[in-house]
């Protein structure tokens, strides 16, 4: 059973998502939060697997709450950012903060449930279109922030190649076509990249690739 918490300042949104998810046999909504501070508190108390996190909330916004939760060793929840807004303003910062992906608030019940399953399973819900927005935002912010590049040396040539292509916005299927390998092989390579670099998911890997300068906007 996937344990989900919903953090949104609109009661109707929380209720709607609870109804949608409650109809799924493998998902249980264990709690709600009406602002970011409450989200942090309840996440520590309830230990959900996935948190649906609104961005614009009172007291503490969703980005700050995401950052705090991601840094807490006693909370292992994955975070899906809920949005009705254009992502350009905060896609990069949300991913740097520890979000595992984005979900539009008007997503269908099927899309909502599938998004929860994807993130709970350890993957990132990050469409190539969102990756391209991330790249543009990174370019606007001025390039590498110079974290340690030492771990990149642990990657094989093929793993580095896969990381570069993923970071340029290609889907697993597109990477597979470019490298003439199966999609499952690409998934295996991505998994090894995450393990070797000590990263949580695809979203973190893309941010890491740009921050180390492995990939640069416009390459």
Where on the chain are the PLM-derived regions?
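Short hydrophobic/Thr-rich beta-strand motif most characteristic of the beta2 strand and flanking loop
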Residues: 26-34, 42, 199
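Active-site beta3 strand of CheY-like receiver
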Residues: 46-52
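Active-site residues of response regulator receiver
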Residues: 8, 54, 83
């Amino acid at each position: 059973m996937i344990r989900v918490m919903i953090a949104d300042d609109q009661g109707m949104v929380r209720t709607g998502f609870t109804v949608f998810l409650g109809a799924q046999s493998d998902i249980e909504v264990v709690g709600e939060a009406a602002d970011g501070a409450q989200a942090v508190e309840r996440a520590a108390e309830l230990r959900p697997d996935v948190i649906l996190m609104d961005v614009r909330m009172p007291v503490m916004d969703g980005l700050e709450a995401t950052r705090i939760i991601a840094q807490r060793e006693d909370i292992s929840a994955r975070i899906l950012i809920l949005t009705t807004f254009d992502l350009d303003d905060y896609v990069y910062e949300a991913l740097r903060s520890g979000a595992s992906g984005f979900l539009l608030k008007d997503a269908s019940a099927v899309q909502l449930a599938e998004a929860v399953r994807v993130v709970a399973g350890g993957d990132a819900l990050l469409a190539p279109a969102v990756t391209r927005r991330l790249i543009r935002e990174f370019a606007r912010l001025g390039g590498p922030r110079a974290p340690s590049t030492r771990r990149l040396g642990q990657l094989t040539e093929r793993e580095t190649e896969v990381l570069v292509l993923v970071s340029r916005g290609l889907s697993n299927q597109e990477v597979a076509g470019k490298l003439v390998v199966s999609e499952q092989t690409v998934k295996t390579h991505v998994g090894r990249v995450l393990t070797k670099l000590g990263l949580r998911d695809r979203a973190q890997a893309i941010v890491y690739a740009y921050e180390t300068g492995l990939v640069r906007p416009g390459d």
